[in-house]
């Protein structure tokens, strides 16, 4: 394994003070390591991903480090290092796949990659110029996964990545 990529110590997260979703969750991930979170519905897997993605501000932790440096999930420099594909995503419904990929690359300050091998590997050739809202759940998921893999972020977070495929 490589260097430690992400360390989260004693993370607690909630949507309301009365309902704690995560309590005392610790996690460490090495560079190039693949890890999966397994748990019952409502166990907090998606909540954990929302915290790391900077989408859930109601959390506390004893320490969060990215590549050995303390990090704030909501800061721009960390956002540019990670990409998240959520289980259900109806964002960017008026974009085609090509437009979405170009938009994401611009947001991440990366040049437009050649995603043709990924498009071919996902059997997605005929869908690249169709609005995301017109795609099936599975093909919309493919569009987001192709974008994620083409972007090559240091930290890739996938919530139920094979649902709908």
State where each predicted segment sits.
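Hydrophobic anchor residue at the start of the ABC signature
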Residues: 145
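Conserved ABC ATPase "signature" region
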Residues: 112-128
């Amino acid at each position: 394994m490589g260097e430690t990529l992400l360390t989260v110590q004693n993370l607690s997260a909630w949507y309301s003070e009365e309902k704690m979703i995560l309590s005392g969750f610790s996690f460490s991930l090495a560079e190039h390591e693949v890890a999966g979170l397994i748990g019952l519905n409502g166990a907090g897997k998606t909540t954990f991903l929302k915290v790391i993605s900077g989408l859930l501000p109601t959390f506390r932790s004893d320490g969060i480090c990215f590549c050995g440096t303390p990090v704030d999930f909501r800061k721009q420099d960390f956002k540019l290092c990670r990409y998240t594909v959520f289980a259900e995503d109806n964002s960017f419904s008026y974009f085609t796949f090509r437009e979405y990929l170009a938009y994401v690359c611009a947001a991440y300050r990366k040049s437009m990659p050649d995603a043709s091998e990924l498009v071919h590997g996902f059997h997605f050739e005929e869908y690249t110029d169709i609005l995301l809202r017109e795609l099936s759940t599975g093909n919309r998921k493919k569009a987001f996964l192709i974008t994620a893999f083409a972007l090559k972020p240091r930290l890739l977070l996938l919530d139920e990545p094979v649902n709908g495929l």
